[in-house]
């Protein structure tokens, strides 16, 4: 039993109202490019996060797991119907498609010359690009990217799960839009 004035979880109608208010503050288009993300549960998790943060399109390229794989669909929990997923034969082709659509391509990767994500130019229409679980973004994707950014980490682990990295990058892009707008 909760005491009067204690926080309570929102009801579904309250959540819908809250989400509508955030959607009104959202102008920029946000997309993803997945370069050979091979594990179906990672693809499904990324799709679910993408749907939650208003991503309009996901380009899948290279040896990327299919969003139709049973494990991807199970992890996505039906949200795959809310995000357009398109296949491209290569990361370079996917990056070119994103650029042709007016999106700035920002690869999330640890490289020489990469900038911290919180300093990356995330304003406007952006396509965040993430790579394979073991090898990261391909050389072709890094060459095609407008910017390469990394997620600063202070712990003793050298990398993040690709689905976690996607969630952090997407949330930072939206947070920046909402706080700068």
What is the meaning of each model-derived region?
Residues 1-181:
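Post-transcriptional modification and biogenesis factors for structured RNAs
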């Amino acid at each position: 039993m909760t005491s009067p004035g204690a926080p309570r979880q929102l009801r579904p109608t309250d959540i819908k109202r809250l989400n509508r208010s955030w959607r009104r503050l959202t102008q920029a288009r946000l997309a993803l490019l997945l370069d050979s993300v091979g594990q179906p549960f990672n693809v499904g998790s990324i799709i679910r996060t993408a749907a939650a943060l208003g991503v309009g399109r996901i380009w899948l390229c290279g040896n990327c797991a299919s969003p139709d794989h049973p494990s991807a669909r199970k992890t996505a929990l039906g949200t795959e119907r809310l995000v357009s997923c398109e296949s491209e034969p290569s990361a370079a082709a996917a990056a070119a498609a994103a650029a042709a659509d007016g999106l700035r391509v920002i690869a999330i990767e640890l490289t020489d010359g990469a900038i911290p994500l919180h300093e990356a130019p995330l304003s406007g229409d952006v396509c965040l690009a993430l790579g394979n679980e073991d090898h990261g973004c391909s050389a072709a994707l890094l060459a095609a990217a407008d910017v390469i950014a990394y997620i600063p980490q202070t712990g003793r682990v050298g990398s993040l799960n690709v689905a976690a990295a996607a969630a952090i990058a997407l949330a930072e892009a939206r947070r920046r839009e909402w706080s700068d707008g």
